[in-house]
UniProtKB/Swiss-Prot annotation:
One of its GO terms (molecular function) is rRNA binding. One of its GO terms (biological process) is ribosomal large subunit assembly. Binds directly to 23S ribosomal RNA and is necessary for the in vitro assembly process of the 50S ribosomal subunit. It is not involved in the protein synthesizing functions of that subunit. Keywords: Ribonucleoprotein, Ribosomal protein, RNA-binding, rRNA-binding. GO terms for cellular component: ribonucleoprotein complex; ribosome. Disulfide bonds: none annotated. This is Large ribosomal subunit protein bL20. It comes from Syntrophomonas wolfei subsp. wolfei (strain DSM 2245B / Goettingen). Belongs to the bacterial ribosomal protein bL20 family.
Amino acid sequence: MPRVKGGVTSHKRHKKILKLAKGYRGSKSKLYRVANEQVMKSGQYAYIHRRLKKRDFRKLWIARINAAARNNGTTYSRMVHGLKVAGVDINRKLLAELAISDPQGFTQLAELAKRSVQ
């Protein structure tokens, strides 16, 4: 049985990796070995940052809620506690969106939270 050289398979594999490395700087988009290393590292970065994205958005929402709450004479922690005591079940994403898009509605929630804590 003759030996199969595998040129077609190797070429396809190399093309696939170089296509994934398109847009990378320098040899990372030109040379197969370097490109392969960078594609693998990029996959690791993507995996890690898909998890970090959730934390980052939560931080952003909390910062926005805190800023809006301070404009209404309270703090983030007091407001969230007040809403929990009042039985208002609203998540931070919606609360942050409300603070931006409907300041009057947010003010009403802030007043409700202040009343329920006292």
